[in-house]
């Protein structure tokens, strides 16, 4: 019995007895994922050139998970604007020039059978914090060390972090556009899905 026949048999069994297997495929809005084991987005803070570009580390990290059998691989928090990064070492999709660095990762992970998604994020008042390569863990990074002026819905700071500048209405609309543009870049690169990060106290959950 071929692998496809085995999958079809499992799916038929799930339909008849009301149970679903962990390794059964599932379809969401026309997108079929090969199983129900997914790699969640977990930030590695490894864009060490501080340019938002993925590196050979990211290739190994994500493609090996795809080869290992994950049904969906969701790439870590990826900033829609440079000032929206959680740290200077975060990935980004805020510019067309970043797209080519992603293509080989996505293409090879999909060739290994995984469905590829990316989590888009803007950290708002929790941006510009430290990462392992530059220090300042749980602190705001000084501008001379690669940090930047952070923004938020108000000028209220988060804990010990620097005070943000309150966003204007026009800036809020511009950030909405940033999410849209990053999503279109992800689509053009070949990602199958986009996840909007609206938790953990980042910008969307700050309003």
Label every PLM stretch briefly:
Residues 79-80, 123-124, 193, 200-201:
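Conserved beta-strand edge residues that scaffold enzyme active sites
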Residues 84, 127, 203-205:
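Short, function-defining helix-loop hinge/capping sites that tune catalysis or transport
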Residues 121-191:
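Non-globular sequence segments
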Residues 2-123, 130-132, 163, 175, ...:
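N-terminal capping/small domains of soluble enzymes
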Residues 167, 195-207:
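Polysaccharide-binding and catalytic clefts of secreted carbohydrate-active enzymes
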């Amino acid at each position: 019995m071929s692998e496809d026949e085995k999958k079809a048999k499992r799916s038929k069994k799930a339909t008849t007895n009301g149970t679903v297997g962990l390794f059964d495929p599932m379809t969401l809005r026309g997108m079929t994922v090969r199983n129900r084991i997914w790699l969640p987005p977990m930030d590695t803070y490894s864009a060490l050139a501080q340019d938002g570009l993925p590196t050979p580390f990211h290739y190994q990290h994500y493609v090996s998970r795809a080869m290992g059998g994950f049904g969906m691989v969701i790439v870590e928090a990826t900033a829609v604007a440079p000032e929206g990064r959680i740290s200077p070492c975060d990935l980004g999709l805020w510019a067309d020039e970043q797209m080519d660095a992603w293509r080989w990762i996505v293409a090879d992970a999909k060739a290994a059978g995984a469905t590829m998604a990316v989590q888009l994020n803007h950290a708002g008042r929790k941006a510009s914090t430290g990462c392992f390569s530059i220090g300042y863990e749980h602190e705001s990074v000084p501008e001379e060390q690669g940090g930047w002026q952070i923004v938020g819905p108000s000028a209220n700071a988060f804990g010990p972090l620097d005070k943000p500048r309150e966003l204007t209405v026009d800036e809020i609309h511009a950030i909405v556009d940033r999410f849209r543009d990053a999503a279109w870049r992800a689509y053009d690169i070949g990602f199958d899905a986009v996840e909007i990060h609206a938790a953990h106290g980042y910008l969307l959950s700050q309003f």
